[in-house]
Amino acid sequence: MTKKGNMRNTINNIVILTGAGVSAESGVATFRGPDGLWEGHRVEDVATPEAFVRDPDLVQKFYDERRAKLKTVEPNAAHQALAKLDKTWAGELLLVTQNVDDLHERAGSKRLLHMHGELNSAWCRACDAHFA
């Protein structure tokens, strides 16, 4: 960088990592913490293929509750700002999120990777079908 504030002239590639904090501002509960989504559930009981085999109703209920809550929240200023950067940045940009919600997409982000999957999509191990 030759001058302060001249970053756009020297930086072409950006990778951004977001986590629970960005969606918590919209009212999405985090997985950890005193009121987190894991409270009252062991990860092994709701978030593994083995859990689904053992108790598919519990797993389905757990995720149905998360999906229902997601319908009641909206992207916040952080989601909007990242979507604007995605739209206007001429270079390469990748937004990597640890979140399973769709708030980045709803804000308009296109160059996005979900590290832990997406709450609104599923994959069948038996037939390799994808559901959204």
What do these predicted regions represent?
Residues 2-132:
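Conserved catalytic core of sirtuin-type NAD+-dependent deacylases
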